[in-house]
Amino acid sequence: MEGSFNSKERRGHPRVFIDLPIEYQDMGDPCLRGAIVVNASDGGFLIEALKDISVGTELSITVLYPKGFILVDFKVVAKIVWKKPYSKEDLNGKQYWRGYQYGLEFMQISDEDRWKLTFVIGGRLESEKNPPSQSYQP
């Protein structure tokens, strides 16, 4: 396992369990790939992905989420701070998915996209009262 994960000692922001698709791109690779955000906070994500990516790699990420009957998104740049191999099994113990879990720390996020992140992870009521600008129309 590269890096380490100790939730009590290293986590600076509370986590919210979510299940959202993302598109990501390694900053040095033109190929778009998909993954799933498992949990999120104001400071980063836990994602599950098939591709083996090195700790320290920066990713350009687009998070897709539903708002009413439409799919909207927000973008972040994040760095992989830890990774571990990960697999899932069905109720009979048969493995049906194998990939990696990655701990990501946000490096860049715009004010508008941070507002969208806050909306997604639970600050919906407060965020709707105080949007960053009147021009925001998802």
Report each predicted region and the residues it spans.
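N-terminal helix initiation/capping motif
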Residues: 1-40, 48, 118-138
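Short coil/turn motifs at beta-sheet boundaries
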Residues: 13-15, 40, 54-56, 71-73, ...
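Short coil-to-beta-strand transition motifs
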Residues: 15-17, 31-32, 69-79
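Short conserved beta-strand and strand-loop elements enriched in small hydrophobics
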Residues: 21-26, 57-74
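Short, conserved beta-turn/loop elements at beta-strand boundaries and strand-helix junctions
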Residues: 27, 42, 82-89, 111
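Short, surface-exposed secondary-structure edge patches
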Residues: 48-54
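C-terminal output/interaction extensions
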Residues: 88-138
